[in-house]
Amino acid sequence: MSLWQHIRRSALLLPLLLAACAGQGIQGASSERDIARVEAYFHTVDLKAAPFSQVWPDGAVGSGELAYHPGYLDMRFTAPHPMTLHAEGRHAVFTDSATGAETRIGLAHNPLGLLLDNPVHLGGAVTVTDIRHAPGVLQLSLARTDNPSQGLVTLRFRDSAARLALYEVRIVDERRRVTVITLGSG
């Protein structure tokens, strides 16, 4: 078998492997507690004018302020130039002020849509595929239960004194392109 055939076969099997892994989910009392804590965070979070930075898949960097509560996201970029992303429910609109372009995005098959349910529920249609702990950090990865190959969202929280604070969202789309959003001013 040639190298090209091996790569092609591997690429064809990848969605099946992702589906198998995501379908297993995370089990155990500790994992259930972590999931419940993250759900509780999303039930009460109400970010307003939170500074953020974003690294796009091509390495370009942007920054601005965002507002978020379950079912709603508004990102106002100030760098590299004024842009907005407004997402509510199942749709998002990206507006680039420099070009005047407006792009409408359906979120039913987009990883970002995992965070726009109201309330956010980490079960049923959403599968927690991985939970990791480091000192002062809780990390959860999420995928759509019915089609995990559509993308993955990894959430990183500061975990101090039993309180969670979201500080990073890493989104991997169906083409394995990575976008990283970091909350905070530095």
Question: Whereabouts are the PLM-identified features?
Answer:
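Flexible, processing/modification-adjacent segments and terminal tails
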Residues: 36-52, 56-57, 95-152
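N-terminal leader/targeting segments and the immediate start of mature chains
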Residues: 21-63, 69-71
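Gly/Pro-enriched, hydrophobic low-complexity segments
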Residues: 123-124, 130-186
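Short hydrophobic/aromatic-rich beta-strand segments that constitute the beta-sheet cores
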Residues: 52, 73-77, 92-95, 140-142, ...
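Bacterial N-terminal signal peptides
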Residues: 10-20
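An acidic-aromatic
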Residues: 65-114
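Short, solvent-exposed coil/turn segments at beta-strand boundaries
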Residues: 44-46, 67-73, 87-91, 157-166
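Bacterial N-terminal signal peptides that target proteins for export
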Residues: 2-12
